[in-house]
Amino acid sequence: MLDLTGTPDTLAAGRPGKVGLLELRYVRVGGRTELVDRYQKSPLQIMRPLYIDPSRPDLPVTYLMSTGGGIIQADRNRIDIDCGPGTSVHLTTQAATKVHRMEFDHATQVVNLTAGQGSYVEYLPDSLIPYRDARFYQHTQVTVDPTATVLLGETIAAGRLARGERHAYRLLYSDLEIRRPDGTLLAVDTVRLDPHGPGPVTGPAVFADHDLMASLYAVTPLAPADRVADTLHEALAPTGLAFGVSTLPDDCGAWVRVVGSDPPALTRAMRAAWDALRWSLIGVPAPDLRKT
């Protein structure tokens, strides 16, 4: 990725509008969770948290948004989210994250998510869509207290499928680390998608002949890891999609990876998995979150 660093003919990294910052802090106030601190710098911003989950009126839903209509060359974004003790939060995006074509340099996004003691956090952004010649690196660092629960999702598309673009991006790298507050490593997911590299992105261990790849992690003390894995398997088995489920170390949870080529079918499958986890862990269904 460093080999692609250069001076673009548009606004360079570090210029106004190129460094997006979003800092959010949630605390439990009375009987519900509230956003008490917010700092945002364009192109990143949020919609005011909404209490629209009928089964969990204490849980705010926060939509992460971009004023720029997507990620463009030389963007440097950072999102820091601190969910304090006893909080319950759902975080998602307003729509898919579009990574636009780049002729110079690259774009990066760093996400730091902290789940405090006894918290319940859902971070479920919509899909990431890399356009032709996109160059993008994302690093997600999740710190989870042993008494906290985090549901974390990610979906990557092969490109603008409606336009026939499949793996026309230049590079797409993504690193995920899940740790305890003392630094103990629970999970690492390293994705290196380079259509021009030695390992084909359409290989059997990557996309194979599919157009979409999604992952869902459930780190929780609310149920044994085997039961979490069984919940995911039972939710996804009827979908007909290819998927694999595995438990995480130290009985801390489970995760699943799903591949497919029909965006609505994959979206329904991931929602079914999310809904099943909610019923199993907190006894309520997933809400209907309408998006544009």
Regions found by a protein language model. Give the residues of each.
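Structural motif
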Residues: 88-90, 120-122, 149-151, 214-215, ...
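Short, surface-exposed recognition loops or helix-turn segments adjacent to catalytic cores
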Residues: 126-128, 153-158
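Feature marks extracellular polysaccharide-active and adherence modules
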Residues: 84, 143-145, 179
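A short, polar/proline- and glycine-enriched secondary-structure boundary/capping micro-motif
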Residues: 45-48, 100-106, 133-135, 161-165, ...
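N-terminal intrinsically disordered, cationic/polar leader segments
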Residues: 2-21, 25-41, 108, 114-119, ...
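N-terminal, charged/glycine-rich beta-strand/loop interface patches
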Residues: 1-127, 132, 139
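A structural signal for small-residue-enriched, beta-sheet-centric alpha/beta enzyme cores
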Residues: 156-292
